[in-house]
Amino acid sequence: MNKQPSQLAGVYAVTQPRPDLQEAVAAVLRGGVGIVQYRDKSEDADRRREEAGALCRLCEEYGALFLVNDDVDLAAAVAAHGVHLGRDDGAVVAARQQLGDTAWIGVSCYDDLDRARRLVAEGADYVAFGSIFPSPTKPESGLAPMELLRSGREATGCPTVAIGGIDAGNIHEVAAAGADAAAVVSALFAAEDPEAAARQLVAQWQRSR
């Protein structure tokens, strides 16, 4: 899949563990999600590799981007489209050397525009700011001003992703504020019907662009 900035757009699903994760990811893809990030902090490396490989193949079937959270080795092993790095997840330069020029490398920038500039200069392809709203997934996260979504793009020239507490009731706010994509966790993967939740989020996003 050739890397185009326009691919990094819309509703961006970040997984959380659940026993039927493959079925849930298939459901959100049917619902119109175009980006999936696999996030699993467990120590079961074999299960994570098997699960990530299956999800990568599933995303390929739907023409969606598949990224791995934190783990560059896992991203390389399953031929993911890229990796998302947090504060302590290793250097962008090292990830680029391992994954190659065609891989997507995203970075968490919290509320730090200087960090965004620095990591894009090192080779990151997109920057994520948040938590934009209070997050049920990471309640300890500080809040980032919504203005960063637009100023971050202007400062770096790269797509910006909003993350933190985003659901169907507020996704229109981050769309209107200039985010290229909205990362969603609980509103998709804690939903009783992930496909319906995805359709609602995608519709709200599209109405607000």
UniProtKB/Swiss-Prot annotation:
Family listed: Belongs to the thiamine-phosphate synthase family.
Lineage of source species: Bacteria, Pseudomonadati, Pseudomonadota, Gammaproteobacteria, Chromatiales
Gene Ontology CC: one annotated term: cytoplasm
Organism (species): Halorhodospira halophila (strain DSM 244 / SL1) (Ectothiorhodospira halophila (strain DSM 244 / SL1))
UniProt record, GO biological process: thiamine biosynthetic process; thiamine diphosphate biosynthetic process
Cofactor note: Binds 1 Mg(2+) ion per subunit.
Cofactor(s) listed in the protein's UniProt record: Mg(2+)
Residues the entry annotates as binding Mg(2+): 70, 89
CDD domains: TMP_TenI
Top-level lineage group: Bacteria
The protein, known as: Thiamine-phosphate synthase
